[in-house]
Regions:
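Catalytic and substrate-binding regions of extracellular carbohydrate-active enzymes
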Residues: 1-143, 150
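Beta-strand-rich recognition/accessory modules
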Residues: 78-80, 155-161
Length: 161
């Protein structure tokens, strides 16, 4: 459960190291969506997706499996005020633009997670951005340009915790 049910295993955001909750009390929704030939757009709102595990069924499953729903494992109080992810697809070009709107209830540390399966990612710290390049064995390439209004720290790791 620390991987497939945990936000750490997905290309998403951690808030002070905390992951999205499990259960119906944590949820996201899609307020806008458009699909066209030249451009497609959607925005997902995950503002209510973070917090402690409180659903009785998941508390019981955690107990039975030995899963610890603790801050050290990524589950704690919600410090998130807003998380909206905008995704734009430019026709059939293979180009996607992802823009995250993030706001904390207080000053928080944001962790933007990117995962790769086959080959390690490469990271470049440039003056106004961080550029992350991922490749696969079939010559596929993905490039992420990360921009932030605050100072950033980067790390490439091969573990979830």
């Amino acid at each position: 459960m620390y991987s497939y049910r945990n936000t750490r295993a997905h290309n998403s955001i951690l808030v002070n190291g905390m992951t999205q909750t499990i259960g119906t009390e944590g949820y996201g929704w899609i307020p806008r969506w458009y699909e066209g030939e030249k451009i497609s757009y959607m925005v997902g709102d995950a503002s209510n997706a973070y917090g402690k595990i409180t659903a009785p069924i998941w508390l019981k499953r955690g107990e039975l499996s030995g899963t610890q729903y603790t801050p050290e494992k990524g589950w704690d109080e919600n410090k998130l005020k807003m998380f909206r992810r905008h995704i734009i697809q430019l026709g059939n070009t293979g180009v996607y633009v992802i823009y995250d709107e993030l706001e904390g209830k207080e000053a928080v540390t944001w962790s933007y997670l990117l995962h790769t399966v086959e080959l390690p990612m490469e990271m470049q710290e440039l003056p106004d951005e961080v550029k992350v390049t991922g490749k696969n064995k079939d010559e596929g390439i993905s490039v992420a340009h990360l921009f932030s209004s605050a100072k950033t720290e980067q790390a490439i790791v091969d573990t979830f915790f």
